[in-house]
C-alpha cells in the first residue's frame, strides 16, 4: 500500500510517501516540505500547497492520503491555517477518488514510538530508524509526514476490520428491526 502522509501547515506543509507491505515493513519513497511565506496572501498560500499536493499525487500515485487531524490549539489562527492546508490536500485527493484518512497526533506518536506523548525528537528518531534512513528527515514537518504515512500503513488493517464489523452490525440491526416490524404487523392482525 502506498500512502502519502501530510503534516498540514500554512508555513510548512510536510509531505511524505511510504510503501507498506505485509506486517510492519515500510519503505520510504519521498519526503519534502512545501513552504509558503507568511506575507503571501492566504489564497496564494493555499494554492501553492494544493499545487504541490496535486503534483505529488500525480507523481507518486498513493492509494490513500493520511492527514494529521487538527485538534484544538492555543493559537486559533494557527489551527485555522493548519485545517485549511489539510483541507486543500484532502480536496486534491478526493478529486482523484483517493481515500483520505485522518489520524490524531497522539495516534501517530503511539504508532511510531509506542507513546502518545512522545516529543518531536523521539518521533524523528523512530522514523529514521523504522525507515532505515541514513540521516534524519528535517525539518520536523518532514519527519511527521513520514510518521503519518507509517501510522496509516500499520493501522489500516485494523481500521478495515473495524469498518467491516460496523457494517455487519448495521446489517444485523436492519434485519432485526425488519423482523420486529414483521412480527408487530402479524400480531396486530
UniProtKB/Swiss-Prot annotation:
| Keywords noted in UniProt | Cytoplasm, DNA damage, DNA recombination, DNA repair, DNA-binding, Endonuclease, Hydrolase, Magnesium, Metal-binding, Nuclease
Q: Where in the cell is it found?
A: Cytoplasm
Q: Which residues bind Mg(2+) 2?
A: 68
Annotated InterPro entries: RNaseH-like_sf, RNaseH_sf, X-over_junc_endoDNase_Mg_BS, X-over_junc_endoDNase_RuvC
For this chain's record, the cofactor binding note is: Binds 2 Mg(2+) ion per subunit.
Q: Which EC number(s) does the record attach to this protein?
A: 3.1.21.10
Annotated positions binding Mg(2+) 1? 7, 141
Please give the cofactor(s) recorded in the UniProt entry for this protein. Mg(2+)
What Gene3D superfamilies does this protein's entry cite? Ribonuclease H-like superfamily/Ribonuclease H (3.30.420.10)
Question: Which top class of enzyme applies to this chain?
Answer: hydrolase
Could you state one GO cellular component term attached to this entry?
A: cytoplasm
Q: Indicate the principal place this protein occupies in or around the cell.
A: cytoplasm
Is DNA repair given among the entry's keywords? yes
HAMAP family recorded = RuvC
The record describes the protein's role as: The RuvA-RuvB-RuvC complex processes Holliday junction (HJ) DNA during genetic recombination and DNA repair. Endonuclease that resolves HJ intermediates. Cleaves cruciform DNA by making single-stranded nicks across the HJ at symmetrical positions within the homologous arms, yielding a 5'-phosphate and a 3'-hydroxyl group; requires a central core of homology in the junction. The consensus cleavage sequence is 5'-(A/T)TT(C/G)-3'. Cleavage occurs on the 3'-side of the TT dinucleotide at the point of strand exchange.
Assembly and partners?
Homodimer which binds Holliday junction (HJ) DNA. The HJ becomes 2-fold symmetrical on binding to RuvC with unstacked arms; it has a different conformation from HJ DNA in complex with RuvA. In the full resolvosome a probable DNA-RuvA(4)-RuvB(12)-RuvC(2) complex forms which resolves the HJ.
Similarity annotation: Belongs to the RuvC family.
Matching PANTHER family: CROSSOVER JUNCTION ENDODEOXYRIBONUCLEASE RUVC
**This protein's name:** Crossover junction endodeoxyribonuclease RuvC
Query: Which lineage is the organism of this entry classified under, starting from the top rank?
Result: Bacteria, Bacillati, Actinomycetota, Actinomycetes, Mycobacteriales
> What is the gene name?
ruvC
